[in-house]
A protein has these predicted regions:
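Alpha-helical DNA-contacting segments of helix-turn-helix folds
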Residues: 20, 53-62, 103, 107, ...
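Helix-turn-helix
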Residues: 11, 15, 19-53, 57
């Protein structure tokens, strides 16, 4: 007979996500997750075939939190949709630095490419600017590099700018690139 389940997969994932939020992804060990649950590591291995499986579930949950923040930011309507995506990315880095590091600053060697909404963003740029696919892709990549740089500075506590200043900068990046594209 299999061991009795003391904690659900969801409880274990939630605990592992909270550990990641507080201490970073490296803090996820079966022993530490078990200790946080007030037990041994055994329930972790009962619920998951391996730590890799649990870590994959934590990444999925972190991405779901990011998507939720992005959707919330877009639906608030404070910024145009494309800008909202950048503002949400930076806000996620500011509010959830360890989850941001997990999703967007970890070594990807050996991992499959993840789109993370790239094609949707390129389509949005095409619609807003009238650029062809290749030009819109370059445009978005250049914007994303600037947004990612600001987000990394927030996630690493290098700076803590006011979000209105960040908004102004994103507008400047967008308008500058758009002006250059039109001139070409």
């Amino acid at each position: 007979m299999p061991p009795k389940v003391k904690f659900s997969k969801e409880e274990i994932i939630h605990t592992a996500v909270e550990l990641t939020r507080e201490q970073g992804f490296d803090a996820i060990t079966a022993r530490d997750v078990g200790a946080r649950l007030g037990t041994s590591s055994k329930p972790v291995y009962t619920a998951f075939a391996s730590m890799q499986e649990l870590k994959h579930a934590v990444i999925e949950q972190a991405y779901a939190r990011y998507q939720q923040l992005e959707q919330q930011t877009v639906s608030e309507g404070k910024y145009p949709p494309y800008k909202s995506m950048g503002m949400a990315y930076i806000r996620f880095a500011q509010e959830e630095p360890n989850l941001f590091r997990l999703l967007f600053m970890r070594d990807r060697t050996g991992e499959a490419d993840t789109d993370y909404g790239y094609q949707d963003a390129v389509q949005m740029v095409q619609t807003q600017t009238g650029l062809d696919q290749d030009s819109a892709s370059l445009f978005h990549t250049e914007i994303w590099i600037a947004v990612h740089g600001i987000a990394v500075m927030f996630a690493t506590a290098y700076l803590d700018w006011d979000m209105e200043l960040v908004s102004r900068m994103l507008t400047d990046f967008y308008q500058g690139l758009k002006s250059r594209q039109i001139a070409e």
